[in-house]
A protein has these predicted regions:
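Hydrophobic alpha-helical interaction segments
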Residues: 52-130
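Short gly/ser-rich loop at a beta-strand->alpha-helix junction or flexible surface loop bordering the NTP-binding
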Residues: 1-48
Length: 130
């Protein structure tokens, strides 16, 4: 999510999973992680749409938005329904966004263990560039 050429946030949770084709569920609430939120979690109404705003784990910049949104995706994934199609989507995303192991090492400590566990169990880690 961008304002005046500066990245301020990104979609997360079911909203992000649906945008990337990782789920067919359509959320009735959009979740957004943003720099502009001071509370940990806040729910607002925009017209007739419900939006959950979450405070970012770290400052979101043009340089780190891709790795942060990717790690949030990995944190939101359920491994119960993980298949080859989802692996292909995530591998393409890793390559498209240029995500590398140095970025993962830098930002992984900010996320719950589930994000890294999913990254390893899904074998996506093997597709990440050195």
């Amino acid at each position: 999510i961008e304002k005046c050429g500066k990245i301020n946030g990104f979609y997360m949770g079911l909203s992000a999973l649906n945008r990337y084709g990782l789920t067919t569920q359509v959320p009735n609430t959009t979740e957004i992680c943003t720099n502009n939120e001071t509370s940990k979690l806040r729910s607002v109404k925009v017209g007739n749409m419900s939006v959950i705003l979450r405070k970012s784990r770290t400052a979101i910049t043009n340089e780190n938005v891709d790795i942060l949104s990717f790690l949030e995706l990995m944190n939101s994934l359920s491994m119960d329904s993980f298949d080859d199609e989802k692996r292909d989507i995530l591998c393409s995303l890793v390559q498209e966004k240029g995500i590398n192991r140095q970025q993962i090492s830098r930002y992984a400590p900010l996320f719950p263990d589930k994000a890294m566990r999913n990254l390893i169990e899904s074998e996506i880690i093997y597709y990440v560039a050195q």
